Every structure is written in structure tokens, then in C-alpha cells.
Amino acid sequence: MNLLFKALSHPVRRRIIDMLRKGPMASGDIAAAFDMSWPTITGHLNALKEAGLVSPEREGASIRYRLEISAVEEALAFLLAMTGAQAPDEDEGTPR
């Protein structure tokens, strides 16, 4: 859990997660959205991967990253439990 929250602490990583909410993306497309060096973006992607927030899939010569929703849900459930709040029921949109 510590790796997950550490990964979420950086604004670039949160922006990458937001981009991946729309679907998987090639690493080159992710990098093109930022004015940063390739090694810096790779470092951010590796931090997200180590935290279990994204998973890479090789596609020919490129790597596509996709968001691991279960890791995001796990973090949300942890935060809700810490505050005493309840997660909404997926089927009804009401608290459990």
C-alpha cells in the first residue's frame, strides 16, 4: 500500500493515471503528452507499475500501458475505511 500512495503522490503520475482511464496507451503516446525526457517518463511509468497501478503489454516494438482498476479500488477502499465512510454499492450506487 505504501508504494501505491507514494506513486500517487506525484502530479505527473496522477495525470498518467487520468490519461489511462480512457483506455490503454502506448508509452510513446504517454511521453508525447509531457515536456519531459524519455528517462523521466520511464521512471514515472516504472513507479506506477511497481505500485500495481498500471500494467505493461508489449505490442510489437512498443509497450502499451493500461490502468489496473483493482489497485485504484483497493486504495479507495483503504481510504474510505480509514475515514469510517462506506463505499457505494456498485449495483445500486448506495452505501453498503
Language-model segments: which ranges?
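N-terminal helix-turn-helix DNA-binding core of bacterial DNA-binding proteins
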Residues: 2-40, 59-72
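Amphipathic alpha-helical dimerization/coiled-coil segments
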Residues: 22, 69-96
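Residues within the DNA-recognition helix of helix-turn-helix
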Residues: 44
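Alpha-helical DNA-recognition elements
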Residues: 47
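Glycine-centered, phosphate/nucleic-acid-interacting loop/turn motifs that mediate DNA/RNA or nucleotide
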Residues: 52
